[in-house]
């Protein structure tokens, strides 16, 4: 079964907690703090794999979590970093943030790695917080939480030649004739509901990839007949091979079919018409085929190359395949990379902003959110340090400028506090 979309949840590992420890050694009564740092959490990394051609695996497993870093230990021993979690995806996968719809990455090469969730920083041990005025700190930092998000994966096939045409035009028969692909073939429309890939051997060491795109109908550019899902794959092909039914079956007119297909490609993405386009006039073994072929040639008037074929009998396939190979050989290997957009707006490392949202004063800033997340709010010394840091950063002043009053809720990251007053500052909810 072919799956070309998937939704998965990724969670990077939290950083390990810093350690609270004091040196204990014979004849050294005041050894001082020696708590080590926690290790960094593992990141979640997507890796392009040319051996995969479907997102089927993500139908059965949707949640992925990297291990956290180890906690720090006494004697200044640091925790081990968590191992990164590597998830293999097909080449041609576009990765989007589910919450924003923005593009994180476009995986276009085998072995390409993309970090989609970064592991949290390890917390610092109490040895870091010793000073001449505070020689025995009894607190350490917690590990920073790892990033987490839902991702939308969208597979766009990477193929040299893409077959486009109406349902039942003979595309599946064609690809089964020229490659080892074995798509479902039957005498009714929409037999092919998922793309099929086949490798076409031209000569010794020479081959190209052909994609059988499910049939298009009028209105496909607007999503009619699952058109958006099918046309998405055409974008990644280097050459378009339009397969037209010359038999005139059920009153079909190859000239009309040609014009409708051309229009659908243009309306979906005008850039598709800049690709080389070759026409395969199929089913030339039928009664009215030659007459319809002459009409098509007159209509096109040499604008596109036409190759009369019969996918059923194999007639005319060899010249068509060699011509496709000639065209492919002259085309440069274009970069198919989609320019990633910023998934999260860059926040200043030092600064922060205060916004009032639904009656709650929300503080946003990379450093201040990390500071709160890595503070052990059950430890009085750690909370005192947090309060002093807030004062140095000017948090209370900014909250007052935003209109905060005693008793109002203040949210920083995932934590909420009650604003008390100028002297007491913030009190955890």
UniProtKB/Swiss-Prot annotation:
It is found in: Cytoplasm. Its cofactor is Mg(2+). Mg(2+) binds at residues 172, 192. Pfam families: DUF1967, GTP1_OBG, MMR_HSR1. GTP binds at residues 165-172, 190-194, 212-215, 282-285, 310-312. Belongs to the TRAFAC class OBG-HflX-like GTPase superfamily. OBG GTPase family. This is GTPase Obg. It comes from Carboxydothermus hydrogenoformans (strain ATCC BAA-161 / DSM 6008 / Z-2901).
């Amino acid at each position: 079964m072919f799956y070309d979309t998937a939704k998965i949840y990724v969670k990077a590992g939290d950083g390990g907690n810093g350690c609270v420890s004091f040196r204990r050694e014979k004849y050294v009564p005041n050894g001082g703090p020696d708590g080590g740092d926690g290790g960094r959490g593992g990141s979640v990394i997507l890796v392009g794999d040319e051996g995969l051609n479907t997102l089927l695996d993500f139908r059965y497993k949707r949640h992925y979590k990297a291990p956290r870093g180890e906690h720090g230990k006494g004697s200044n021993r640091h925790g081990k970093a968590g191992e990164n979690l590597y998830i293999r995806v097909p080449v041609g996968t576009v990765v989007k943030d589910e919450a924003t719809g923005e593009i994180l990455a476009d995986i276009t090469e085998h072995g390409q790695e993309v970090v989609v969730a970064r592991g949290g920083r390890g917390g610092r041990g109490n040895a870091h917080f010793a000073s001449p005025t505070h020689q025995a700190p009894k607190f350490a930092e917690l590990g920073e939480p790892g990033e987490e998000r839902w991702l939308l994966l969208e597979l766009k096939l990477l193929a040299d030649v893409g077959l486009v045409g109406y349902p039942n035009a003979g595309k599946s028969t064609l690809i089964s004739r020229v490659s080892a692909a074995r798509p479902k073939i039957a005498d009714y429309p929409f037999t092919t509901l998922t793309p099929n890939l086949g490798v076409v051997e031209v000569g010794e060491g020479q081959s190209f990839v052909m994609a059988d795109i499910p049939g298009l109908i009028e209105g496909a550019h607007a999503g009619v007949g699952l058109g958006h899902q099918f046309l998405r794959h055409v974008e990644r092909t280097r050459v378009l091979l339009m397969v037209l039914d010359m038999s005139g079956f059920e009153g079909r007119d190859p000239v009309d079919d040609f014009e409708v297909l051309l229009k659908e490609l243009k309306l979906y993405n005008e850039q598709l018409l800049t690709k080389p386009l070759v026409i395969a006039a199929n089913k030339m073994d039928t009664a009215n085929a030659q007459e319809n072929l002459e009409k098509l040639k007159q209509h096109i008037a040499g604008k596109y190359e036409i190759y009369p074929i019969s996918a059923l009998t194999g007639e005319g396939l060899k010249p068509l395949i060699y011509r496709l190979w000639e065209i492919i050989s002259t085309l440069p290997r274009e970069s198919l990379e989609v320019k990633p957009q910023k998934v999260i707006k860059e926040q200043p490392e030092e600064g922060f902003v205060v916004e009032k949202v639904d009656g709650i004063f929300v503080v946003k800033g990379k450093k201040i959110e990390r500071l709160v997340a890595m503070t052990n709010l059950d430890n009085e010394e750690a909370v005192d340090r947090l309060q002093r840091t807030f004062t140095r950063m000017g948090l209370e002043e900014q909250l007052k400028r935003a209109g905060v009053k005693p008793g109002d809720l203040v949210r920083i990251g995932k934590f909420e506090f009650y604003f008390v007053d100028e002297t007491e500052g913030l009190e955890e909810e």
